[in-house]
């Protein structure tokens, strides 16, 4: 599902950017940043930085009612957030163009904070990170810095729907004398 979400978002971003820049091969793609120094796709690259568990929803009980007084022991869904980086990966001679592309990408993020993939709604927002954290991220990605923004995609839910036990709740008490 992570691939579908990032691919869909990159496709929507590419469609938006194509209004301003006319490139038949497109301007947004999902990919690794800093994978090779000689590789400069001259595009806005959408890359996964981190997956984190969403904890604000609280802890759900593993017992779920499934109807007719029956219950099932099911693990609650895993709620996740995706931290992504949107980086304008251009060669040095096109630095000004990369800044323009980053500005247009931020306009897209601001104008489209919600999107739907396969019937599930997601939100995206920019994340503030310190200069030190940004430096650490770029060091992990290979050391080459590109103009970029870090965003968080919220509300990814992974549910295996595995039932570990089932049974019935008691109905009317039966008293034998």
Residue ranges and their predicted role:
Residues 74-91, 103, 146-155:
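Oligomerization/assembly interface segments of phage tail-like spikes and tubes
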């Amino acid at each position: 599902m992570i691939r579908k979400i990032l691919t869909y978002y990159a496709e929507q971003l590419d469609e938006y950017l194509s209004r301003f820049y006319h490139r038949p091969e497109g301007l947004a793609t999902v990919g690794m940043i800093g994978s090779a120094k000689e590789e400069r796709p001259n595009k806005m690259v959408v890359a996964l930085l981190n997956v984190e568990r969403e904890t604000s929803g609280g802890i759900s009980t593993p017992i779920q009612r499934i109807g007719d007084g029956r219950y099932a022991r099911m693990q609650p869904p895993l709620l996740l957030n995706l931290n992504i980086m949107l980086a304008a990966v251009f060669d040095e001679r096109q630095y000004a163009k990369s800044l323009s592309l980053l500005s247009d990408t931020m306009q897209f993020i601001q104008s489209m904070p919600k999107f739907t993939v396969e019937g599930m709604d997601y939100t995206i927002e920019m994340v503030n990170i310190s200069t030190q954290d940004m430096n650490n991220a770029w060091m992990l990605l290979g050391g080459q810095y590109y103009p970029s923004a870090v965003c968080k995609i919220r509300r990814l839910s992974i549910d295996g729907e595995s039932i570990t036990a089932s049974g019935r709740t008691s109905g009317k008490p039966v008293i034998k004398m």
